[in-house]
Swiss-Prot record:
GTP binds at residues 18-25, 82-86, 136-139. One of its GO terms (cellular component) is cytoplasm. Its main location: cytoplasm. Keywords: Cytoplasm, Elongation factor, GTP-binding, Nucleotide-binding, Protein biosynthesis. GO terms for molecular function: GTP binding; GTPase activity; translation elongation factor activity. Belongs to the TRAFAC class translation factor GTPase superfamily. Classic translation factor GTPase family. EF-G/EF-2 subfamily. This is Elongation factor G.
Amino acid sequence: MSDQEFGLDAIRNIGIMAHIDAGKTTTTERILFYAGRTHKIGEVHEGGATMDWMEQEQERGITITSAATTVFWLGSKINIIDTPGHVDFTIEVERSLRVLDGAVAVFDAVSGVEPQSETVWRQANKYGVPRVAFVNKMDRMGANYFGAVESMREKLGANAIPVHCPIGAESQFVGMVDLISQKALYFLDDSLGAKWEEREIPEDLQEQCEVLRMQLLEELATVDETNEAFMEKVLEAPESITEEEIHRVMRKGVIEGKINPVLCGSAFKNKGVQQLLDVIVKWLPSPLDRGNVRGMNLKTGEEVCLKPSKDGPLAALAFKIMTDPYVGRITFIRIYSGTLKKGSAILNSTKDKKERISRLLEMHANERTDRDEFTVGDIGACVGLKFSVTGDTLCDENQEIVLERIEAPEPVIDMAIEPKSKGDREKLAQALSALSEEDPTFRVSTNEETGQTIISGMGELHLDILRDRMIREFKVEANVGKPQVSYKETITKASDSETKYVKQSGGRGQYAHVCLEIEPNEPGKGNEVVSKIVGGVIPKEYIPAVIKGVEEGLNSGVLAGYGLVDVKVSIVFGSYHEVDSSEMAFKICGSMAVKEACRKALPVILEPIMKVTVITPEDHLGDVIGDLNRRRGKILGQEASRNMAQVNAEVPLSEMFGYMTSLRSLTSGRATSTMEPAFFAKVPQKIQEEIVKK
């Protein structure tokens, strides 16, 4: 099908999201198969999944990057992004949700809501992404569809509404009752799920299905309270309500974020995936339903509102960078307004840099097809952009707009890295530069005292995979040190400084004079540097140099050399010399001034605190809690179900190295654990002294 056939109302930009191992990628593979995009089903456990195209993904059976593809169903074009479920790759989920219009949340029928399900659900809430839920793995031992629905309500605060009633469970799962059409769907095993039979609802389920359908209708009546005719029918003649009426109200409720309909199935056993495809088209929003896109005009500071129209001015967001050995740098974009043509010149308004598009590519995992243009609602990739990174806005040169950026969390773990030979040094620098462009949560810095290169990321798996990619993709041999905690520094009170940088050694000298005021910024807000210079006491051409110097000064703290965070700096006064002042002098002076001010502002060291979830047999609960307490953990609460207990805690990352090994020995290998970064907190004084000594 050509793209010209699709109006905006027939486009769906959706993500598939879940906890690791809930079956996201398998669900996506079945969608590709049924929609005719692939002619053979790829299996994750065999390393053959189309969407898991990186070697590391196929070996480890997990999704690391967000793969994109397009399928066609019920006369609509569906752009799908399959996202990772592992906490170390949370930025992949964040940047995908930022550009999507809707999402399918996949849950395991046995486990229900798991820790990473909560994380991705929160991320979707943040961007207001409408969702439907798919309870997968109904064929597993212990599968409980209604238990999963209940856990969505309890743990996510979701208004989860069952639209199916399973027929059988575990190995006896043969299909489901569709509560909207009031038909029982039985899947024929010999057709790989492509065919099913519609039958009457089995007698033993009729009463339960009547109750569930009535609950569904009553919930829908609260979605659209202005629709009095629908409410009246629900109260007086529910049997007269048509399927079309239900779909119309359901769609409205989903788009407004008031309800989350829940389907069931088994992607691996080919049951229920086409029904999921149907509701993606019927209930999830098109770009039109998501409304106008808001941004800011950087020159005037005014809010700009653009309609999703292909004839409007261009507004697109770069949400991912990928390096390809043959094509080079590929930038993934979502177009919110206007049309982008191959060969056109555009503006990166975030950086105020002109860019030129050399090629446009439609992606299917790592395969690509050349395109002449992308228009509003499209998700695609372009080649030729030199300056654009994740979160940058691309627009027309004469109509500047900057869209909301994508926030990247602070890394929590560091490793030293060095090339194995001199020949690897340049290749290592290129690899680190390319990988940090691709991934905003991967940072590269230099330890000022030792001169070592330090790489920082979201966890051991994150850095392990990036190291693996350096060897395979960039052919770099490197030695890495042990993982270390990525500490930060901050200040606890306001302070100021007055610094002069004067050098006289014959000929032209160096002169700069800078006065700063600093104060603690809101936790998590990052560093802010502003100029309050008036009257030209520092000429305006030198102000950027002072700001650059201050920013560089904040990169290494005053206690133990860790980067400073959450510091607000105001440049308030200074002076210059007609001959001796230069950009370099003001940059050095800015760096010295901020260090001096920070020393007087009662600096402290911050450590990453992890949100830890442990699921353990109840007879080991006391040992697990005792062990977490010994690790300076704070127990937030515990829940019990089926002889298992779930413990939620906040524990400093420095205490969690080797935790899985110790947990296995404590519980004879019967407990599981997940952890994700929660926030940074001040370290106890005794530990701070030990860190500074090191």
